[in-house]
From Swiss-Prot:
Keyword terms: DNA-binding, Repressor, Transcription, Transcription regulation
HTH gntR-type domain location: 10-78
Taxonomy, superkingdom: Bacteria
Residue ranges of DNA binding: 38-57
Protein name: HTH-type transcriptional repressor YtrA
Gene name linked to the record: ytrA
Known role: Negatively regulates ABC transporter complex ytrBCDEF that plays a role in acetoin utilization during stationary phase and sporulation.
GO MF term list: DNA binding; DNA-binding transcription factor activity
PANTHER family xref list: HTH-TYPE TRANSCRIPTIONAL REPRESSOR YTRA (PTHR38445:SF9)
Keyword field contains Disulfide bond: no
PROSITE patterns, sorted: HTH_GNTR
UniProt-listed Pfam families: GntR (PF00392)
Amino acid sequence: MIQIDPRSSTPIYEQIIQQMKELCLKGIMKPGDKLPSVRELATIIIANPNTVSKAYKELEREGIIETLRGRGTYISENAKTTLVEGKMTMIKEQLKQLIIDAHYAGVELEKLHEWIKEISADVKGGKKND
């Protein structure tokens, strides 16, 4: 389920958050799925329960999970929608910055369109561009 890289510069609680979000976006974890308790997950990934609790609190604040007192913690019904909307907002901001950078570098909009089509074709074809 979740794999922590102790050598990573990313804090463990952020690794938990990111991986939970990825599992939801990929459809591996679905709305209504029950999560391990804080102590259970801490034992599984060999982390401090306070670290797992911090991740769960942030995921709950973002609307990805919900805790039902006495019943456990579950993936919220709106988790995927919330995550997709967040991703789209992030992509739009990145695109905006890219267009600004391209403008100052003298790259014409038509050239950007051409590159987008090329890269899109590569992605759809399963090719990787390094």
